[in-house]
Amino acid sequence: MIPVVIEQTSRGERSYDIYSRLLKDRIIMLTGPVEDNMANSIIAQLLFLDAQDPTKDIYLYVNTPGGSVSAGLAIVDTMNFIKADVQTIVMGTAASMGTIIASSGAKGKRFMLPNAEYMIHQPMGGTGGGTQQTDMAIAAEHLLKTRNKLEKILADNSGKTVKQIHKDAERDYWMSAEETLAYGFIDQIMDNTKVK
């Protein structure tokens, strides 16, 4: 169930679903697993807000366990494509593909709430049963290329070396807000809409 808010206007009362109301304030909610339908919705909202006014920041709130690499990279590419700066605010968890998205916000405008967590790891993939050996080799090569691409993005976003990212992402690597700030994935920790 999506909450509805009622707003008083000069023409009377108007009701909005909460996400439409937040969009009026240039706020986009990226919550739940990253998948194609969710990514398409986020991309459409980014493009809409950029077309409305490319000089005003867009606020992307992130709380996701991660998900599809291709869907996540489509969001990142759109964030980089539009003219408006995208501020990212991590609440809850930014894990896996969520870290790629959250750390790709405009430099100096990547935030995290005090009790939120970050997690990086290597991408996951596989082939189903009955797969031919040559198809398995193709899938393994693609997975390695994907890992290299994601590690380069994380290195660029954090200031760490690709070698350091590769080492840390070998297994699930969890970070608190303070650790994420020290690592370089965010620029500041927020508390009550104030920056620490």
UniProtKB/Swiss-Prot annotation:
Keywords, alphabetical: Cytoplasm, Hydrolase, Protease, Serine protease
Entries under CDD domains matching the protein: S14_ClpP_2
Record-annotated active site: 96 (nucleophile), 121
Enzyme Commission (EC) number: 3.4.21.92
SUPFAM superfamilies assigned to the protein according to its UniProt record, in alphabetical order: ClpP/crotonase (SSF52096)
GO BP terms in the entry: protein quality control for misfolded or incompletely synthesized proteins
Cited InterPro entries: ClpP, ClpP/crotonase-like_dom_sf, ClpP/TepA, ClpP_His_AS, ClpP_Ser_AS
Pfam families in UniProt: CLP_protease (PF00574)
Entry superkingdom: Bacteria
GO molecular function: ATP-dependent peptidase activity; ATPase binding; serine-type endopeptidase activity
Localization per Swiss-Prot or TrEMBL: Cytoplasm
Substrates-to-products reaction catalysed: Hydrolysis of proteins to small peptides in the presence of ATP and magnesium. alpha-casein is the usual test substrate. In the absence of ATP, only oligopeptides shorter than five residues are hydrolyzed (such as succinyl-Leu-Tyr-|-NHMec, and Leu-Tyr-Leu-|-Tyr-Trp, in which cleavage of the -Tyr-|-Leu- and -Tyr-|-Trp bonds also occurs)
GO cellular component: cytoplasm; endopeptidase Clp complex
Function: Cleaves peptides in various proteins in a process that requires ATP hydrolysis. Has a chymotrypsin-like activity. Plays a major role in the degradation of misfolded proteins.
Alphabetized PANTHER family for the sequence: ATP-DEPENDENT CLP PROTEASE PROTEOLYTIC SUBUNIT
Subunit relationships: Fourteen ClpP subunits assemble into 2 heptameric rings which stack back to back to give a disk-like structure with a central cavity, resembling the structure of eukaryotic proteasomes.
Family from the record: Belongs to the peptidase S14 family.
Record's protein name: ATP-dependent Clp protease proteolytic subunit
Lineage, broadest ranks: Bacteria, Bacillati, Bacillota, Bacilli, Lactobacillales
Gene: clpP
